[in-house]
Structures are given as C-alpha cells and as structure tokens.
Amino acid sequence: FIDSDAIFIESNYNEQLLRNSTRGAMDRARVKSGVGHLCNIDAGRFIGRVYNLSARKPANVTLMHLSSDHNTPDHALADFMQASGLAAEALCVRAAPREAVGTEVRLALGPHRRL
C-alpha cells in the first residue's frame, strides 16, 4: 500500500449500526472477528498510516464491500475521514456502491520497481 497511487480497501461496517443490528449475536461477533470484516474506523486508521508513511501520496481511495445491513456510503465516508486524520483535500475518497456500477477509475502501470 505504501506509495500507491490508488487504494481499494474493504470498509464493511459502521460499529454502531452493527451493534444495533437485528442479526444474531454470533453473526455480529463473526463480522467483528479477526476472520470477519474490516470496519470503517480500522480502514481509515490504516490508510492514514499508509498516507503518512508514503513518499508518493495516494491520490484515490475507494471504500469497497460495504455491508447492506451495517453500513451506508455516508457512514463509511464519515467514519473513514475521521479515523484517517486526513483533510478532505488530501485525497479523493469514494464509497463504491453496492448494487450498481460506480465511478470509473482508470489505472495505468508505472515503471516496475524492485522491492
């Protein structure tokens, strides 16, 4: 993720919406577990760290795999921006729609670098 131009990351659930969900306790626990899904806050914190460690800053972040039961695009974006600590002008963040084709993102391959 470091020095990436574009990042696509899961932002599956809002913690309050999950907590208030009608889904059973076992399902809610699975979603939050280490083998479950990434919450909006954790996605934001992670990308905030990536941004700060990157010499070449990412220009675009797309939040993906939003839960239809425990998230909305507005929740995902608000949670992400608050947790990332980044200013809205720092990068373009969008939430991919669940049921439709979203904004087209064009990617180009740059020069190969050895790790």
Please provide the spans of the model-predicted regions.
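Cap/insert and terminal regions of metallo-dependent hydrolase folds
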Residues: 2-95
